[in-house]
Amino acid sequence: MAAYLVLMQEIHDLDGYRGEYVPQVLPLLQKHGAQTLVAGSDQQAAEGEPPNSTVVIRFADTEAVWGFLNDPDYQPVKEIRHRVTTRGQMVVAPEFTPGG
């Protein structure tokens, strides 16, 4: 069953995010069969005050999400994300199946 990685974060260094993090994370997402469904800052708050960036990535299953997050090649890339963002909230959630 598909699973989703949902990340809400405040990007405070856009040049670092776009110039360092994104080019390094995209090949790793491909390696793990991920599909980015939502990415960017063109969002409107329906309730509350969300950070300025939301990302939703679809994986084959929760094991694939954790495989990506725990990939040794991702660890230095994750450090870049931590450096250029704040207020990060990340969740891993399985796809909803009615009656399941």
Regions found by a protein language model. Name each.
Residues 66-68, 73-91:
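C-terminal structural segments of small proteins and small subunits
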Residues 53-55, 88-89:
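Generic beta-strand structural signal
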Residues 18, 58, 78-81:
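Basic side chains
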Residues 1-53, 60-70, 94-100:
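Short S/T/G/P-rich N-terminal loop/turn motif that feeds into the first structured element of a domain
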